[in-house]
Amino acid sequence: MQRSLDSLAGMATSAFGAGTSAAMRQATSPKTILEYIINFFTCGGIRRRNETQYQELIETMAETLKSTMPDRGAPLPENIILDDMDGCRVEFNLPGENNEAGQVIVRVSKGDHSETREIPLVSFEKICRALLFRCEFSLPQDSVILTAQGGMNLKGAVLTGANLTAENLCDADLSGANLEGAVLFMADCEGANFKGANLSGTSLGDSNFKNACLEDGIMCGATLDHANLTGANLQHASLLGCSMIECNCSGANMDHTNLSGATLIRADMSGATLQGATIMAAIMEDAVLTRANLRKASFISTNLDGADLAEANLNNTCFKDCTLTHLRTEDATMSTSTQTLFNEFYSENI
């Protein structure tokens, strides 16, 4: 009896106190020598049973929250009760009149027996909000609720056309997710992982992607006006036809990105690296590319009028049929071929 209550209390503490992949593995692994032996001879039967119970706990919690709260932004109830979890009653008591501990108290009971644990309030609330987020956007619940950094686990999520205006997606894992046509205006995506995600046609204006991973992302036709992409990883990303007016990409890794047809008027790309990038028919008037690494980048039919290339690395950079009037190239490093091109056709601007 006590071992069953203790196991369920441990699962509740792991699921709603951490919610990470490591916490799930720890909570569902065999605990005793006997369980390890049975698990071995049943080809993981103990772990599978525990994982099923863990998943049921999460899904029951999500449904309970959804039915008791008017919307996911509302305050969490002071008492959340899950009845009949494997014959047990699970109660979460949040800090308030009946709980002055400052932590969430978890009580698992069956008959006269009970087990109690404590969960940090901040972690508990973050996990509950993540469950409600999945409910709102009809995403199946996952046993891994949060990333190791504490962001939502939304790996591979389908969020096409979703309204995520001003959403907090810091440190979230959205790798491989489909956000085509979604609205993330003013969303906070600092440190988030969008590797391989589809962001085509998304509205990302005024959003924060500082230090985010957008590697291999498909962002064709996205709007990134005034967005913060400082330190972001955009390697091999497709930014065809993007609007990036006054976008801050300083220090970003944009190696081998495709910026063809993009509008980068007054964009700040200082200190960014664009090695091997393809930039065809883009508008980059007054763009700031100071100290940028443009080695082997290819600029074709691009308007760079008034762009600042001071101290930039232009070794083996290709400029073909570009508008290079009013350029600043002080202390820029360039190959002989590039220097010859500038001297021949644009000497008055050097």
UniProtKB/Swiss-Prot annotation:
Domain Pentapeptide repeat: 162-201, 202-241, 247-286, 287-326
Compartment(s) where it occurs, according to its Swiss-Prot or TrEMBL record: Secreted; Host membrane
InterPro entries for this protein: 5peptide_repeat, PipB2_N
Keyword line: Host membrane, Membrane, Repeat, Secreted, Virulence
GO cellular component: extracellular region; host cell membrane; membrane
Keyword Secreted attributed: yes
Broad class of the protein's primary localization: secreted
Subunit structure: Interacts with the host kinesin light chain (KLC), a subunit of the kinesin-1 motor complex.
Domain notes: Contains various tandem pentapeptide repeats in the C-terminal region. The pentapeptide motif is required to efficiently recruit kinesin-1. No position is completely conserved in these repeats, whose consensus sequence is A-[DN]-[FLM]-X-X. The C-terminal 38 amino acid residues, specifically, the C-terminal motif LFNEF, are required for peripheral localization of PipB2 and redistribution of lysosomal-associated membrane protein (LAMP). The N-terminal 225 amino acid residues are sufficient for type III translocation and association with Sifs and SCVs, but not accumulation in peripheral vesicles.
PANTHER family: THYLAKOID LUMENAL 17.4 KDA PROTEIN, CHLOROPLASTIC
Function: Effector proteins function to alter host cell physiology and promote bacterial survival in host tissues. Involved in the reorganization of late endosome/lysosome (LE/Lys) compartments in mammalian cells. Necessary and sufficient to link kinesin-1 onto the Salmonella-containing vacuole (SCV) membrane. Required for centrifugal extension of lysosomal glycoprotein-rich membrane tubules, known as Salmonella-induced filaments (Sifs), away from the SCV and toward the cell periphery. Required for virulence, but not for intracellular survival and replication in phagocytic cells.
Protein name: Secreted effector protein PipB2
Gene: pipB2
